């Protein structure tokens, strides 16, 4: 999980790619969830 606020899952794709190296993630409860870990 990335502690970043989001409005859409598209915002998380960039953040997840930075965090995990893969642009896989969803915006849930206004926070980004990245997977797989």
UniProtKB/Swiss-Prot annotation:
- Is this entry keyworded Secreted? yes
The UniProt similarity line reads: Belongs to the short scorpion toxin superfamily. Potassium channel inhibitor family. Alpha-KTx 01 subfamily.
Cited function = Reversibly blocks voltage-gated potassium channels (Kv1.1/KCNA1 (Kd=79 uM), Kv1.2/KCNA2 (Kd=547 nM) and Kv1.3/KCNA3 (Kd=492 nM)).
Q: Give an example GO molecular function.
A: toxin activity
This one is known as Potassium channel toxin alpha-KTx 1.10
Known tissue expression: Expressed by the venom gland.
Arranged from A to Z, the UniProt key words for this protein are: Disulfide bond, Ion channel impairing toxin, Neurotoxin, Potassium channel impairing toxin, Secreted, Toxin, Voltage-gated potassium channel impairing toxin
Q: What is known of its domains?
A: Has the structural arrangement of an alpha-helix connected to antiparallel beta-sheets by disulfide bonds (CS-alpha/beta).
- Keyword match NAD: no
Q: Which SUPFAM superfamilies match?
A: Scorpion toxin-like
Q: Where mainly found?
A: secreted
Q: Which residues cross the membrane?
A: none
Task: Give the subcellular location.
Answer: Secreted
Q: Where is this site: Basic residue of the functional dyad?
A: 26
Q: What else is known?
A: Negative results: does not inhibit ERG1/Kv11.1/KCNH2 potassium channels.
Which Pfam families is this protein grouped with?
Toxin_2 (PF00451)
One Gene Ontology cellular component term attached to this UniProt record is:
extracellular region
Where are the residues marked Aromatic residue of the functional dyad as a site?
35
Question: What intrachain disulfides are recorded?
Answer: 6-27, 12-32, 16-34
